[in-house]
């Protein structure tokens, strides 16, 4: 039976709200004065470099910000106007805590949003956008809407970065004792945790609005293979 988009969304918001709420209570591992402190907040060097490159932009959006590590890095590298948004209240609480810890409250505005918030943003508002670990852990319908709206709200010279998890084939899933619903959706304990697509499938979803400038593969700490993806996109110019 097909899953309900709204039901999946509400379950996801509850899951991430609880996950990030637990982080608000423990920021003891973060020392803003330590060397490379903000670099260590990013899950990988590739993601750090992407966020840092947005420091030279005028107005940046960190969509699905989580604890807002990308927004923080962009601000610490020079961007004076960063918006960090997430539908999970716990994520925003965590983000605001980290933002205050680093003293960049005047540069970063973090707030909770609804799933249709992007539709309220004016055309060509941002010249930089980063969206990490979001598109492939939400219902595909919402992911495609985010891609469409992202093209509308960024300027012609904008740089966009989309970080994605690794591709999981049905065969690999089965070998690990898991099954993919509807061909590519992984649910764990009733929570949508992955919508698995190949590099080419993601490139095809971006293609109507964006050109792929680079595609990097990377690993999170502790992972042996660089299988996660980072797409650097540029908006296609009108013909």
Feature roles, as predicted:
Residues 54-55, 123, 147:
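A short, aliphatic-rich alpha-helical micro-motif
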Residues 1-56, 66-118, 138, 142, ...:
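Class I (Rossmann-like) S-adenosyl-L-methionine-dependent methyltransferase catalytic domain
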Residues 120-129:
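A short acidic, Gly/Pro-enriched loop at the edge of an enzyme's catalytic core
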Residues 131-134:
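A short beta-strand submotif of the Rossmann-like class I SAM-dependent methyltransferase core
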